[in-house]
């Protein structure tokens, strides 16, 4: 029996959402129980022996991964959502998109000051959303001690952007090109 890598479970869709784009679809990874288990185990591997108070996941696929990682760590999960999706009091950070601006939010009481947080998402492209998530967590007085992704798109510079902020970045696989 051959063992598949996480990369083998990820489907590439040509010209989605726009012509010239190679979309890396992780839903095929999520749908396969073996692939999903491998991904969660590998997301956790670099952090063996470390203690986290919370896992934060970026909307939307980061919720799937972050929830599973938090379960494995027996810790709480904090969703970082698009503006207007969370009830109650929130704090927000805006960040630049290719054509405009976006805002992400978190509940202002989701994480207690001084907690250590692992940030999780499916894909690292430019790093804008992850950077905004890190800034939200830091506004609450907490420390992001790692950023874990399934896919890194190195040509888009997200890893360099987060490492320039002093973040430790872990990705299970990389896909060159757009």
Swiss-Prot record:
**Where does this polypeptide localize?**
Cytoplasm
Reactions catalysed = AMP + diphosphate = 5-phospho-alpha-D-ribose 1-diphosphate + adenine
Q: Which InterPro entries match?
A: Ade_phspho_trans (IPR005764), PRibTrfase_dom (IPR000836), PRTase-like (IPR029057), UPRTase/APRTase (IPR050054)
An example Gene Ontology biological process: AMP salvage
Q: What SUPFAM superfamilies does the database record attribute to this sequence?
A: PRTase-like (SSF53271)
- Determine the domain of life of the protein's source: Bacteria
The top EC class, named as a word, is transferase
CDD domains in the record, alphabetically?
PRTases_typeI
Which pathway does the protein contribute to?
Purine metabolism; AMP biosynthesis via salvage pathway; AMP from adenine: step 1/1
Query: What EC number(s) does the entry state?
Result: 2.4.2.7
Q: Choose one Gene Ontology CC annotation of this protein and give it.
A: cytoplasm
Q: Which family does it belong to?
A: Belongs to the purine/pyrimidine phosphoribosyltransferase family.
Q: Assembly state and interactors?
A: Homodimer.
The role this protein plays is: Catalyzes a salvage reaction resulting in the formation of AMP, that is energically less costly than de novo synthesis.
Q: What is this protein called?
A: Adenine phosphoribosyltransferase
Q: What is the lineage of its organism?
A: Bacteria, Pseudomonadati, Pseudomonadota, Alphaproteobacteria, Rhodobacterales
Q: Which gene encodes it?
A: apt
């Amino acid at each position: 029996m051959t063992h598949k890598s996480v990369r083998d479970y990820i489907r590439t869709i040509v010209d989605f959402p726009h012509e010239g784009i190679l979309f890396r679809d992780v839903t095929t990874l999520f749908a396969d129980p073996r692939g999903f288990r491998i991904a969660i185990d590998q997301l956790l591997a670099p952090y063996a022996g470390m203690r986290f108070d919370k896992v934060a996941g970026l909307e939307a696929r980061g919720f799937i991964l972050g929830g599973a990682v938090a379960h494995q760590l027996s810790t709480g999960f904090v969703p970082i959502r698009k503006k207007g999706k969370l009830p109650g009091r929130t704090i927000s950070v805006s960040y630049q998109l290719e054509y405009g601006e976006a805002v992400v939010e978190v509940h202002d009481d989701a994480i207690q000051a001084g907690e250590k947080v692992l940030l999780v998402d499916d894909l690292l492209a430019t790093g804008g959303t992850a950077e905004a998530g890190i800034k939200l967590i830091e506004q609450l007085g907490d420390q992001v001690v790692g950023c874990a992704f399934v896919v890194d798109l190195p040509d888009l510079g997200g890893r360099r952007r987060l490492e320039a902020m002093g973040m430790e970045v872990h990705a299970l696989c990389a896909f060159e090109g757009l």
